[in-house]
């Protein structure tokens, strides 16, 4: 087992003074209060994740920045529809499907046959927009790594665009949408393989056989651990629905 560390100081800044552990390695819930105004973290859950293939958008844009943002908006609309499909599929679910979760206290103590709907609304549970390949899409659109001045400017603009989308969805639906750095142990290779077959070998993009995890620095880049943490931290304050950094 490898250890995961959290920064209590930074968590307090990002999560309204709260410190709590993630679900799995990186999934963080948005702050939520009960009817008495008390924060609650235990017993909450995620309804589903849909992940954006950022490098593919960059490939399709062919260096045209206006076209890039247009395709991104189109893909975001599809992601929203997919997440809402997941949400609607869960509505009307009976607590009987998993008594240990819904009746015996793992998540709730509902009656037999009672619907779980109240836990799907109001931000109690989350719906996550994931993303993969910030390094590769930055390389495609700027010709540089996201660690350069120009690359960083584009990468941050893109991340903020994604965060604005989830914030807007949350405001308009009342559901707990969040931005989430996808844990891509298999998806990193799957997306890359799909694009390699469709678009061929592209230097620093499809030729590696994988895409870089979320907002992470390219694993081939020469950078020390502390500089890597410092650089990636600026993306963590945007991707508050799920984030992690590795050394």
Predicted ranges, named:
Residues 127-140, 160:
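Contiguous, well-ordered alpha-helical segments that form the cores/surfaces of helical PPI scaffolds
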Residues 1-123, 144, 148-247:
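Conserved catalytic cores of very large enzyme subunits
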